Every structure is written in C-alpha cells, then in structure tokens.
UniProtKB/Swiss-Prot annotation:
Gene (UniProt): metXS
The keyword Cytoplasm belongs to this UniProt entry's keyword annotation: yes
Name under which the protein is recorded: Homoserine O-succinyltransferase
Active-site residues from the entry: 157, 322, 355
Record site: Important for acyl-CoA specificity: 324
Keyword Cytoplasm applies: yes
C-alpha cells in the first residue's frame, strides 16, 4: 500500500479512453470498424505542443507506465524507473503518453471486447494485429490529443520496435526514436520460443479454440506455462544463478507435483500471478506481432533500405547480458542507420539482469538515458 507516493513519482494517475469511429484498415487485410484505446498521460503539454513523448509498451505491458491508480496499489506502473520528476522521461519537462495496444486486455479493444457484429466477445475472431497497425492507431491518438510531432517515441523490447516503425511510417512526426533492448526482427530461436508459448496456451483444454469466454473459463494453466517460459528468456543465466543457484526449498520430495528448487517456486509464482490479469488471446496476438515485425520484408530483405527515409535521431541502448535481444541485434540497427548517415547514439550497458534490465534502476542506464533526454528537452524548449 502506498500512503504517500515518492517525490520522484508522478503520484496518483487516472486512465483515459479515446473512441475512434473511423474504420482502421489492418495489415492482415481486415479492418476494425470501431475501436477504443485506453491511455494515461503524465506531465503537461506545453503551449507550443513540442514536448510530447510517446511510450510504447512491450509484450505484457499496458498503458499504466508510471504512478499509482490508488493509495492501495502495491506497485507503480511498469516503467516507474524512467518516468517521473527528475527521471529520464522527466515529467517536469515532458508530456508523456502511453496507450494500451490494440488487441490488449487492459481496456483497449481486444479479443475480450464485444464484437458489434455478434454481440459476443471477439475471441478467436479478433483480427491479427501488427506493429504497423499499432503505430497507425497511435498516430490517430496523437491527432486526438493535438500532437503533430512527438519529441520522442520510446520503448524497450517490443516497444522499441514500435519506435522504429514510427520512424519508418511517420518520419515527419517524431524528432527522436528511443530504441532499447530491441532488434530489427526476431531470430528463428525467438520465433520458436513464441510458438512454444502459443502451443502451451492452445493445448490447454480450457482454450476452446479461443472462445473460452463463452464457457466462462480461461486457459490459465497454459498461459501460466507460457509466462514461465517467457520469464526464463527475460533473465540472464548469471542473474538466475545469483538469485537461485541450485537452492532447495527443503528436502528433495522425489515427486513431480512438489516444488523442490527455489527457481521452480519462482517460476510457478510468476505464472500464477500473470494469469490473474492477462488474457490468453492477447498473449497469442502479442507474440504474433513480435514474430511478424520485419521492416526489411518490404525492401527485398534489406533492413538498411527500410531506414533510408527516416528523419529522426535515434538512441540505441542494449544490455550486455541480454540474450533474447543481444547487443549484436542493436548493432545491426546501428550499422543500418550509419549506412545512410542517420544521426544515432549507441551504448551497450554492462548489466547482469538480462533482457528485463530495461525495466530496472541500473545507474549507468539511467544516466545515459537522462543525458540524452536532457538534450532532447533543450532542443524542444521543454
């Protein structure tokens, strides 16, 4: 419970909802006739409208990036380390916006929303959405908020991919792209991880072909296993060794149902906690969006060509122990930008926390991020 938020927090926040009546054409060939985006904002938009920052969330994230919804919240938003007074995304200087992506399960239109054609939840009938679709919907949200150009679009992991897509699709609408712990596209290994996660969900007897809402159930076991698998990939071997080693919770049980090792207990806890407020169909959609992200596909498999016409400056940050999106993947982006003489700053940060390092209060990371954003603030008069 938070009785008084820390002084460097944005404090208590409220969510907003934008409704769009104009159909949204999707990359898959279908369209959403009407949709809603839930979002939060932190800080104030300046008179010139030049200090807006769009934050894009990763696979399991949502619009609640910072602050607290009530004094009873146990934890703040997912990027509390980076959003707030005096932090890299300084809300004394910037107006920060974060929305829940289409297909999400925290208020934006998604599989659990009512399909206007049937009067029932979309379920398996919700269209496949891509990073490009998300960016298009975010551009409409920017229009709704009166933001012609973002000072920066920022995100880690899948959020960083959205920042890249913004730079490609709307080059004139952002001054900076902040791409953290990301990649130009998924490797075969990463696609494989996502497929195993999807199979865990779809093989759960309670999945019912994605129509489980109609049965009043949820494929919780499959979703928990998917989350357990994902969580392993977000941590480094060093971090897991330091945190758990081979520590036992007690004597060996010689039983499959019992939990012997501390790491088993941790993963089961993460899985069970995750299923409390995340939807299985959304997990399927988010992993597919990750798999399909490939800007080079429209340019004869030439990623450099995909970035040829961007106009923004780019900050690339990677973490030494991240093996899901290793530093080598960020350097691929770096080389593609340099090939076209695009302004770019890059830093590989020594960190033991693995892929999830972008969410953590690592001093060198926050210093580098803050220094860059300080320059952005001065550039836009914030």
């Amino acid at each position: 419970m938070v009785r008084s938020p820390p002084t460097d927090s944005v404090g208590l926040v409220t969510q907003h909802k934008a409704t769009f009546e104009e159909p949204l054409p999707l990359v898959c060939g279908r369209e959403l006739p009407r949709y809603e985006l839930v979002y939060e904002t932190y800080g104030e938009l300046n008179r010139e409208g030049t200090n807006a920052i769009l934050v894009c969330h990763a696979l399991s994230g949502n619009h609640h990036a910072a602050g607290y919804h009530s004094e009873h919240d146990r934890k703040p938003g997912w990027w509390e380390t980076c959003i707030g007074p005096g932090k890299p995304l300084d809300t004394n200087r910037f107006f920060v916006v974060c929305s829940n992506n289409l297909g999400g399960c925290h208020g934006s239109t998604g599989p659990a929303s009512i399909n206007p054609e049937t009067g029932k939840p979309y379920g398996d009938q919700f269209p496949i959405v891509t990073v490009r679709d998300w960016v298009r919907s975010q551009a409409r949200l920017a229009d709704e908020l009166g933001i012609r150009q973002w000072a920066a679009v920022a995100g880690g992991s899948l959020g960083g991919m959205q920042a890249m897509q913004w730079a490609i699709d709307y080059p004139e609408r952002l001054r900076h792209a902040i791409v953290i712990a990301a990649a130009p596209r998924l490797s075969a290994q990463n696609i494989g991880f996502n497929e195993v996660a999807r199979q865990a969900i779809m093989s759960d007897p309670e999945f019912h072909g994605g129509r489980y809402y109609d049965y009043g159930v949820s494929p919780r076991r499959g979703l928990a296993v998917a989350r357990m698998l994902g969580h392993i990939t977000y941590l480094s071997d060093d971090a897991m060794r330091a945190k758990f080693g081979r520590d036992l919770r007690g004597d060996m049980s010689f039983d499959f149902e019992q939990v012997d090792f501390e790491v088993e207990s941790y993963l089961r806890y993460q899985g069970q906690r995750f299923v409390q407020d995340f939807d299985a169909n959304t997990y399927l959609l988010m992993t597919k969006a990750l798999d399909y992200f490939d800007p080079a596909a429209d340019h004869d498999d030439d990623f450099s060509a995909a970035l040829a016409h961007i106009q923004c400056s780019t900050l690339l940050l990677s973490f030494s122990s991240d093996w899901r999106f290793a530093p080598a993947r960020s350097r691929e982006i770096l080389r593609a930008l340099l090939e076209h003489n695009k302004p770019v700053s890059y830093m590989e940060i020594e960190a033991t926390q693995g892929h999830d390092a972008f969410l953590m209060p690592i001093q060198r990371y926050l210093e580098a991020f803050s220094a860059y954003m300080g320059n952005v603030a001065r550039e836009v008069g914030a």
